[in-house]
Amino acid sequence: MVPAAKATRVSHAHRAGGPGLTLRENGPALLVPAAWGVAAGAVLGVVSSHALFVAHVVMSVLLVAFVAASWRDMAAGVLRAWKLVILAGTPVTLAGVVGFLARDGAVPAFAAAVPADALLAVAFYSWMLLPAPAFVYTGLRDPAVPRSLVHHVAAACSVAGTAVAALAGTQTGTVAGIALVGAGQTAGILAATALY
């Protein structure tokens, strides 16, 4: 009988220290399900569009702060793949902020010049899909077979949930797509957090 192999870290060029490290390591595992829960709540009318706007602003700040604080830690391997997701996701999230400002008329110049619904759709669908390649890469680099499968399932849920939400045509269908994405990405980020 072969003893179970200890999970190896597949990244970590520089180990950071300090009180913020635990939050940086575990924060995504809390924020991912929260973000998709808020999105589903907005579709169902439980969360106001203003609250969703505030969530976009807060998330934009958190993304920039997270990547700035973790820049050196995310220089290679799996963490570099996730840094690229954050770097691509920050302007996408900001597009959502601008979309809300244009749609609500808070900035009159945006309301006339910016396609609000298109920007909101870019933010919504991009965050459904952006993590998928990083989940695949993480799964390929993760030596623990059960956990690596979770990464691949997370990628599949991201793509399938996006398709469900895009093709649904109903509130219930859109929420089902969000739930599929949220469940997959939450499982994947929990597995990735364990890998880190």
Each predicted region: which residue ranges?
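Membrane-interfacial loop-to-transmembrane alpha-helix junctions, especially the N-terminal start
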Residues: 25-30, 53, 75-87, 145-154
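Membrane-proximal helix-loop-helix units in multi-pass membrane proteins
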Residues: 83-152
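Terminal transmembrane helical module of multi-pass membrane proteins
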Residues: 142-196
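Membrane-helix interface and helix-disruption motif detector
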Residues: 42-57, 98-126, 166-177
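N-terminal topogenic module of multi-pass integral membrane proteins
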Residues: 1-77, 195
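C-terminal ends of transmembrane helices
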Residues: 65-79, 136-142, 186-196
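Membrane-embedded alpha-helical transmembrane segments of multi-pass integral membrane proteins
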Residues: 35-40, 55-66, 88-99, 127-137, ...
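Extended hydrophobic/Leu-rich segments
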Residues: 19, 23, 107-114, 191
